[in-house]
A protein has these predicted regions:
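A short, structural micro-pattern
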Residues: 50, 71-73, 94, 115
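Glycine- and acidic-residue-biased ligand/ion/polar-headgroup-sensing regions
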Residues: 52-54, 60-89, 124-125
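A short beta-turn/loop motif at secondary-structure boundaries
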Residues: 47-51, 113, 245
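Conserved short histidine dyad/triad with adjacent acidic residue
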Residues: 15-17, 37-70
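Alpha-helical bundle regulatory/interaction domains
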Residues: 1-30, 35-39, 86-239, 244
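Conserved hydrophobic/aromatic beta-strand scaffold that supports enzyme active sites
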Residues: 48, 56-58, 76-78, 99-101, ...
């Protein structure tokens, strides 16, 4: 019989997923549904690191998948993408310098191609505000409305991703650092806040092109059709039904 999990096991969770129906396993801060889009053996890895009140979540996939993800109440999400990541977020193609900010309970649709890596930073909004207020920078605080794509200097966004990836690599090799030493979790969270806020300071609202807007509109149409189909279990659906949605 397996004993009670150690502090290190609670702080660092690694989940390897081969079945998309298990996509929500071991990730209590996110609600996630996934669909595999290629008929080959799937290998998705998720690493979650719990800091004092924040969390860092790493995802990678070897195949094309589509997910619907939302952050549970009480957290804001900031998502960065690896240098080899190809795909879309809410229909918007992932590209260098792109950063996504999302409020809690806001569903986002993501299509990830094979070789994808992303890191999601989850933080309580009151912690961000407290961090800024202590440094007399409270005016910088902004709660995203829905899902906000942001654009910044690609090098700045890359540094944020690299910081998160280094944290993940450290947690994989030395999980006890985060589970047994509160000082390490506190230091990591403070460094996360400084690194994230430094990136947000140089970020602007994303200026979408006409092609971007077309892709985003198509994404909304697909999502609406899927929602309708899922609400009609067991019924035979026709294209004319979807046209009425």
């Amino acid at each position: 019989m397996k004993g009670k999990p150690t502090a290190a096991e609670n702080a660092v969770t690694v989940v390897d997923i081969s079945d998309p129906t298990a996509a929500n396993t071991g990730v209590e801060l996110l609600d996630l549904d996934a669909v595999q889009l290629q008929s080959l053996p799937l290998r998705v890895r998720r690493v979650m690191i719990r800091l004092e009140s924040a969390a860092v979540v790493f995802h990678s996939t070897n195949l094309r998948v589509r997910t619907r993800t939302s952050v549970r109440s009480g957290f804001l999400a900031y998502v960065t993408f690896g240098p080899q990541a190809h795909g879309t977020i809410n229909g918007l193609p992932v590209r260098p310098g792109l950063l996504l900010a999302a409020e809690s309970e806001m569903e986002n649709t993501l299509v990830a191609e094979g070789g994808w890596e992303s890191i999601t930073f989850l933080l309580p909004p009151e912690d961000i505000l407290a961090h800024l207020t202590a440094r007399q920078r409270a005016a910088e605080f902004h709660v995203p409305e829905g899902a906000e794509p942001l654009q910044a200097d690609p090098e700045s966004v890359r540094r944020l991703f690299d910081w998160g990836k280094l944290l993940v690599d450290t947690a994989l090799f030395q999980p006890a650092l985060f589970g047994e030493q509160m000082k390490e979790r506190v230091n990591a969270q403070n460094e996360l806040l400084e690194t994230l806020l430094a990136t947000l300071r140089v970020a602007d609202g994303f200026e979408s092109t006409r092609n971007d807007r077309t892709r985003q509109a198509q994404s909304v149409i697909v999502k609406t059709a899927e929602d309708y189909a899922m609400a009609q279990p067991g019924d035979r659906l026709y294209v004319t039904d979807l046209c009425k949605v």
